A protein has these predicted regions:
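Mid-to-C-terminal "cap/lid" subdomains and adjacent gly/pro-rich loops that border
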Residues: 155, 168, 297, 307-423, ...
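N-terminal glycine-rich phosphate/pyrophosphate-binding loop and immediately adjacent elements
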Residues: 16-145, 149-152, 321-322, 332, ...
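Short acidic, glycine-rich loop/turn motifs
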Residues: 84-91, 270-277, 355-357, 421, ...
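Short, glycine/acidic-rich hinge or "gate" loops at secondary-structure transitions
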Residues: 157, 486-498
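C-terminal structured subdomain/cap of oxidoreductase catalytic cores
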Residues: 19-53, 101-102, 106-107, 243-252, ...
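Conserved redox-cofactor binding core of oxidoreductases
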Residues: 126-257, 266
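Surface-exposed beta-strand-to-loop junctions
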Residues: 96-104, 116-121, 164-174, 210-216, ...
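Fungal secretory targeting signals
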Residues: 1-20, 288
Length: 586
């Protein structure tokens, strides 16, 4: 974007702010999902759309554009950093939850990895009561939004294989592989090692069956060598539309129509401008909250939508009694190990290995399935108690049973192992579990401070989650100690084989994981798309229960964790949600 367009962006934002205009649709948050919704709704020239975004337009920021310096923006001004204290399961450590503060949201600061997950996980959404939400339906929207750039022959030789039938070729979102993936030695040795461990190469991660080993695509433009975030993909082609405006500001709460009907009716949002002024913007039709899995529940609570017990403590009158708001927060549990290489590896290592429960637990799988099933009720009771009964034990147990079925009967992938070369002769091996039974929560910390949420991480709060992460860690260690991959490894520099030997006991693993496990920043579920009686916040039309015209579209509505990176599902969900909103026009 040139200087003129930058000034134009600021001018439009200023004018919209100064007038406190009214639009057909107003979207809180110009992030990954919000800009998808804005683009699709504004395709009709007679529909006016406004996006309120607190962050800047960073499309020309070299740090954002770069595909070589991943996570360089983690401590920058374009990154929200929300603190959280863990429980004794993780040694009461401080954790930081991060989200993008920019046009494009977290898609402007993340690792760009594009993995959708398993078919059965999406089909479970429909089993949970979300009519029409299943693998086939969401899959069609994945293809609608994607412009997949096929890899070169050189890239294919080092593992960048693909199945053209599972990708789109004319959507707005570029998806492909970096120009230089890795030299051949790493791919050949890693492929052979994983194949010897029963996890051989697959053609494509994104066809709904990701079990195995393969290079992972990323949301980037391989021809230009730049990141493809939602601002580039969805806002750039739409920014010249006169019916689409971006307003600089921070949404605080929904404004409501007077009256006490059965359904609450939103009239717009109240937001804070960069100057600190409190301004109201009107919505003729609907408001859409796309403020992230951290902030979307906060906006609802600040507006009187949530658990009356929590709202009362905050001094907020209850507008809609909806106890599920802010609950069911789920994240992946991630751990990293570092290896020194015997020779340097050039290029990007971007390979994912995704195992099932059988791959991870082996002969213990059946007995573990049985013992775990017996614990679901007690886990559900304990989790319900931590939220003072916000979601009933029976509702949680029903959701747990479906998750248990996915893990042990549907044979979904339950973990991911992802190596990255550090550029200084080292290799960072990250591994995480994808389907934890540990849930946390996110709520307002005070009535008027939406900037500092109260986050309860609650990671590794069930013994199964610890057992699962331990088993995945052992699988990771085994791979790097198995030929021919071990030929590339000089030693394990962190934690080191002295602290965590290859034959480490369960107790040694527990000590290591409790001191080192982190949140993977793949948060979903805090405004879950579920029936209200199951702890849901939005229905299958992404409309907030008890409201006539309030919708939520972002990672917060994904009802259960997926074996993928959250960004890809958010794009698919947002595309489908946009059509659900459009359907209400008829």
């Amino acid at each position: 974007m040139n200087t003129y367009k930058s000034l134009q962006f600021l001018l439009l934002a200023y004018l919209a702010t100064a007038r406190g205009d009214t639009f057909d649709y107003v979207i809180a948050g110009g992030g990954t999902a919000g800009l998808v919704i804005a683009n699709r709704l504004s395709e009709r020239s007679d529909i006016t759309v406004a996006v309120i975004e607190a962050g800047d337009d960073v499309r020309q920021d070299p740090g954002v554009q770069s595909i070589d310096f991943l996570f360089a923006n983690f401590n920058a001004s374009i990154n929200y950093q929300y603190p959280s204290v863990t429980g004794p399961e993780l040694g009461s450590r401080n954790l930081t939850y991060r989200a993008g503060k920019a046009l494009g949201g977290t898609s402007a600061i993340n690792g760009m990895v594009y993995i959708r997950g398993d078919k059965a996980q999406y089909d479970a959404w429909e089993k949970l009561g979300n009519k029409g939400w299943n693998w086939n339906s969401v899959f069609s929207y994945y293809k609608l939004g994607e412009r997949f750039i096929a890899p070169s022959s050189a890239q294919i030789e080092v593992g960048a294989t693909y199945d053209a039938s599972v990708h789109g070729d004319s959507g707005p979102l570029d998806n492909g592989f970096p120009f230089i993936i890795s030299n051949g030695s790493f791919y050949d040795k890693a492929r052979a090692t994983w194949e010897s461990l029963g996890l051989g190469p697959i053609t494509d991660l994104n066809g709904g069956d990701p079990r195995g080993f393969v290079a992972a695509p990323q949301t980037l433009d391989p021809e230009a060598g730049v990141r493809e975030d939602s601002a580039r993909a969805y806002y750039t082609p739409a920014e010249a539309r006169t019916n689409l405006k971006v307003i600089k500001g921070t949404v605080k709460r929904i404004t409501w129509a007077s009256g006490s009907g059965k359904q609450a009716v939103a009239t717009g949002f109240e937001y804070v401008s960069p100057s600190g002024a409190i301004i109201k913007v009107g919505a003729r039709k609907e408001v859409v909250i796309s403020a992230s899995a951290y902030r979307s529940p906060l906006i609802l609570e600040a507006s009187g939508v949530g658990n009356p017990k929590i709202l009362k403590k905050l001094g907020i009158p209850t507008k809609v009694n909806l106890p599920g708001v802010g609950e069911s927060m789920q994240d992946h549990n991630i751990v990293a190990m570092t290896y020194n290489l015997s020779n340097n590896i050039t290029g990007r290592i971007g390979y994912a290995t995704m195992p099932t429960a059988q791959d991870v637990f082996g002969s213990k799988t059946s007995s573990l399935a049985a013992s775990t099933f017996k614990k679901l009720r007690s886990w559900a009771k304990a989790l319900s108690a931590t939220s003072d009964g916000a979601i009933s034990p029976s509702a949680i147990e029903r959701r747990f049973r479906i998750q248990h079925d996915l893990i042990f009967n549907k044979n979904i992938t339950i973990a991911e192992l992802f190596p990255t070369n550090t550029g200084d002769g080292g290799l960072l091996e990250q591994f995480w579990t994808s389907m934890p039974f540990s849930w946390g929560s996110v709520h307002l910390s005070s009535r008027d401070n939406i900037e500092v949420p109260s986050i309860t991480a609650n990671l590794l709060s069930t013994d199964f989650d610890l057992d699962m992460l331990t088993a995945v860690g052992r699988l990771s260690q085994k791979a790097y100690a198995t030929a021919p991959l071990t030929d590339l490894i000089a030693d394990n520099s962190s934690p080191g084989y002295t602290k965590l030997p290859l034959d480490a006991s369960d107790e040694q693993w527990a000590t290591f994981l409790k001191a080192n496990a982190l949140n993977a920043l793949h948060v979903v579920g805090s405004c879950a798309m579920l029936p209200k009686e199951l702890g849901g916040v939005v229905d299958s039309d992404v409309k907030v229960h008890g409201t006539r015209n309030v919708r939520v579209v972002d990672a917060s509505i994904i009802p259960m964790q997926l074996s993928g990176h959250t960004m890809a599902p958010v794009y698919g969900v947002a595309e489908m949600a946009a059509d659900r909103i459009k359907a209400s026009w008829k």
